[in-house]
């Protein structure tokens, strides 16, 4: 069960006022589509096999060559940033190459995070599985076999076992250094770096210490504040990955009503706003999704229900799924929404779970729907979610197809630009 179903930290609604204590040094505002539609994606990209082998050794506690790992990681980031620029992506990142996943990487940075062994004697609650997959156990079995993984079947599962604090900046500094060097070499239009939201960690790093979800979320927010501010101070746009505002409804909180879930979402937004209180909104974006897997998705909470809560988050940009068959229609639902003038929409216009390569004209049509709602300058073309969310999962989209999709995204943005600036 969740905690007290109340915001642990007061919510704030963004206004265009620079907060006191704002990080000035190194900060950049998110680029707008002032004279053409800009392109980006969500973060994770296919990791090179040799890097995967080193990552697996590190995660499982086996001996590995740390110098070889650092050297290969730096080279891989150089390569992947250059590939993004060559594909026509404007706002690039490090592909999350040095992270095991977008959430559990925190065990290398936060104190109080221990591990337990996953498996038959320590299974997670049924709510760890998506509700739509529980409706279709035959498909769930097929999906797990295809991924070569089942829920919590990895050897090492992180959990909160003590007071949470940011204790080791070295992995963060390595990521910042590698992305800085890669961007210096190829000079992209913009670069961003991912970080987990406080709320999403309550699912992927289960609490065994605080025994109160509100207290745990607040502790995570206080700890992650250091990472968030460091990313922005280094000159990158901060992307906070917050599927706790979407997919958590049909897994972690599937036993609750929509109204109860939205109160939890409000609490998580309040924690996120607290953690980013020293960062200008225009230096941040937030990613919302409903689970990066091909499946029925019949229990996804509609965007229309969670959108107003998302608008109360401080980050100026909102990245969200808008290409897959369960959410591609939802642009219609935003036409009647009050969207603050300074919010930037980053709809997914390519699907991250299928090997179909979208036609550039379809991508342009999707971009046009959102440009009609908020204006062309406030739309950036993105992807639904990451292409390599978990390092050791057999991700559905083949690496060569990932790059074909990103090239199609760039071409679709050019087609949309020709239409919108004609």
Regions of interest found by a model, annotated:
Residues 4-6, 15-16:
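Basic polycationic patches enriched in arginine
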Residues 11-29:
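Short, Lys/Arg-enriched N-terminal segments with co-localized hydrophobic residues
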Residues 23-422:
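Domain-level signal for soluble alpha/beta catalytic cores
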């Amino acid at each position: 069960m969740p905690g007290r179903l109340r915001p642990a930290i007061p919510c704030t609604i963004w206004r265009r006022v620079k907060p006191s204590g704002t990080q000035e040094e190194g900060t950049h505002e998110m680029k707008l589509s002032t004279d053409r539609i800009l392109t980006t994606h969500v973060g994770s990209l296919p990791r090179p096999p040799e890097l995967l082998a080193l990552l697996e050794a590190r995660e499982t506690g086996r001996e590995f060559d740390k110098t070889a790992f650092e050297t290969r990681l730096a080279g891989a980031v150089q390569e992947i940033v250059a590939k993004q620029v060559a594909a026509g992506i404007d706002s690039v990142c490090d592909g999350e190459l040095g992270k095991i996943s977008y959430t559990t990487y925190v065990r290398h940075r936060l104190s109080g995070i221990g591990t337990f062994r996953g498996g038959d004697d320590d299974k997670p609650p049924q709510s760890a599985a998506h509700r739509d997959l529980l409706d279709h156990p035959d498909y769930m079995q097929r999906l797990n076999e295809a991924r070569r993984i089942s829920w919590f079947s990895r050897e090492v599962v992180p959990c909160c076992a003590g007071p949470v604090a940011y204790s080791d900046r070295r992995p963060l500094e390595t990521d910042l250094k590698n992305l800085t060097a890669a961007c210096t070499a190829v000079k992209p239009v913009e670069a961003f770096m991912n970080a987990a939201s406080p709320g999403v960690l309550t699912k992927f790093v289960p609490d065994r210490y605080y025994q109160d979800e509100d207290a745990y979320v607040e502790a995570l927010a206080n700890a992650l504040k250091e990472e968030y501010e460091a990313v922005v101070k280094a000159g990158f746009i901060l992307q906070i990955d917050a599927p706790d505002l979407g997919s958590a409804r049909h897994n972690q909180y599937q036993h609750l009503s929509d109204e109860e879930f939205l109160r939890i979402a409000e609490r998580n937004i309040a924690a996120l706003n607290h953690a980013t209180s020293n960062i200008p909104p225009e230096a941040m974006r937030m990613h919302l999704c409903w689970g990066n897997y091909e499946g029925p998705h019949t229990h996804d909470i509609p965007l229309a229900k969670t959108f107003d809560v998302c608008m109360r988050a401080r980050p100026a940009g909102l990245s969200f799924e808008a290409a897959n068959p369960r959410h591609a229609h939802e642009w219609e639902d935003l036409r009647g929404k009050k969207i603050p003038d300074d919010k930037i929409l980053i709809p997914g216009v390519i699907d991250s779970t299928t090997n179909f390569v979208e036609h550039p004209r379809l991508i342009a049509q999707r971009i046009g729907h959102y440009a009609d709602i908020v204006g062309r300058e406030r739309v950036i073309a993105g992807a639904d979610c990451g292409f390599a969310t978990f390092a050791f999962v057999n991700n559905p989209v083949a690496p060569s197809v990932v790059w074909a999709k990103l090239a199609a995204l760039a071409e679709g943005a050019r087609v949309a630009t020709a239409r919108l600036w004609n």
